């Protein structure tokens, strides 16, 4: 046994585990189109766990968005979702919607949001894998970072709040609006509705805390 002192890390609260899981799911939905296994799991999935207290308006909207996403999964086929994902976020020549959230942030000659993001990730010891083709500001990567912050509990709640407000919330809402405006967004219209509602829940929670 190592001589290093053992450290007890308490488990995540049910609320934080639900947050981390939902960030992970949203990251998966936007990183690549859902395959047959994920669609099957979502068809059987229950709504995100809620507290015993009555739901807020934001919580009710999130639950409704979840129900709509599950319903969309019932009639979805992987091949069609692959086509939709490709057309919306990859494109042949140019995607209909950019999934890189720094594109929805103000940029000045003095500051590049992506460079600032990379600097923040480097402070936490995070870096893009060499084989990764997507930049760090891809919506999926930012959601994965939020999940890492919640599950790792190394940076604390204030770091979650700062990262969320600095890189995720406002540009995420603009991304959701851009996807919703696309006529070709069928399944992903429901995915961005879930994301939008979840971001609103997170924003209110951070504002209260």
Regions found by a protein language model. Name each.
Residues 1-209:
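Surface/interface-facing alpha-helical segments and adjacent flexible terminal/loop regions used
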């Amino acid at each position: 046994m190592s001589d290093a002192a053992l450290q007890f890390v308490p488990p995540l609260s049910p609320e934080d585990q639900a947050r981390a899981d939902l960030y992970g799911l949203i990251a998966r939905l936007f990183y690549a189109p859902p395959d047959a296994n994920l669609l099957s799991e979502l068809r059987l999935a229950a709504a995100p766990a809620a507290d015993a207290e009555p739901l807020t308006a934001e919580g009710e909207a999130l639950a409704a968005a979840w129900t709509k996403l599950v319903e969309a999964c019932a009639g979805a086929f992987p091949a069609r979702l692959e086509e939709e994902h490709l057309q919306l976020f990859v494109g042949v020549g140019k995607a209909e919607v950019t999934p890189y959230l720094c594109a929805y942030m103000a940029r000045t000659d003095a500051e590049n949001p992506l460079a600032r993001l990379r600097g923040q990730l480097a402070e936490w010891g995070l870096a893009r894998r060499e084989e990764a083709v997507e930049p760090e500001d891809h919506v999926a990567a930012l959601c994965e970072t939020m999940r890492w912050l919640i599950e790792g509990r190394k940076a604390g709640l204030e770091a979650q709040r700062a990262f969320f407000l600095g890189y995720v919330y406002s540009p995420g809402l603009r991304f959701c609006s851009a996807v919703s405006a696309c006529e070709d967004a069928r399944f992903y219209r429901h995915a961005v509705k879930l994301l939008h509602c979840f971001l609103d829940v997170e924003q209110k929670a951070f504002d209260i805390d």
